[in-house]
Amino acid sequence: MQVRKQQLELDMEQQTGSKKEKEYVKTVYCHPANLTYMQMKEERGKQIFDLMNEAYAPLFGYSALSDRQIDQYIKSYLGFLDLRLVPVVVDEKDQLIGVGIVMPSLSKALQRARGARTIFGYIPLAWSLFVHHAKNIDMLLIAVKPEYQGRGINALIMSYLIPVYHKLGYEFAESNPELEVNNKVQSQWDYFPHENHKRRRAYQKPIE
């Protein structure tokens, strides 16, 4: 099992006047979700979605997932993931503080399936997932516990994932939609060659 360890200095924002005190250093570990799919569902699945709710709560437009929705997502989707592409970050007490979830792009497979929900429609999807994947990877999400944000946890996840991408033959990565004002996630792309090739806009018009 590949494990990456990083010492993080956490600035506890307890200030006396303008003085900031560093109170402690914690050790965190980044490793693949080295579990069976059953263990992933039972042990980490709920933790991952709870972490998402906590990490994304301040973002505009985010609506927290209910327990019923979480159970449905775990049941429906976790079995499709390659757990090598699901790095988790835990603290010294094995508490989840960060996670990244990526998977092979299914865009071409869905085009070949033409929306068919028969066995013939699922064959291209299964082929792309388990036999011959695309050169593109879809970065579905990255979530970090709020008190660890801005401390390099996302860099730890990326430093684990990039060698895995190379090993598995991926050449390009596509991120999910991101808020332009979410500077924390936008700034992580400064270290990579990247292109912003899609932009969405929503407008409102008062009706009198």
Question: Where do the model's predicted regions map?
Answer:
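Conserved acetyl-CoA-binding loop-helix of GNAT-fold acetyltransferases
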Residues: N136, L140-V144, Q149-P163, Y191
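Conserved GNAT acetyl-CoA-binding A-motif
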Residues: N136-I137, Y165-L179, W189
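Acyl-donor-binding surface of acyltransferase catalytic domains
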Residues: M1-L35, R201-I207
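Conserved beta-strand-loop-alpha-helix junction that forms the acyl-donor binding cleft
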Residues: E9, V144-Q149, S175-V185
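Conserved acetyl-CoA-binding loop of GNAT-fold acetyltransferases
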Residues: M1-Q2, Q188-R199
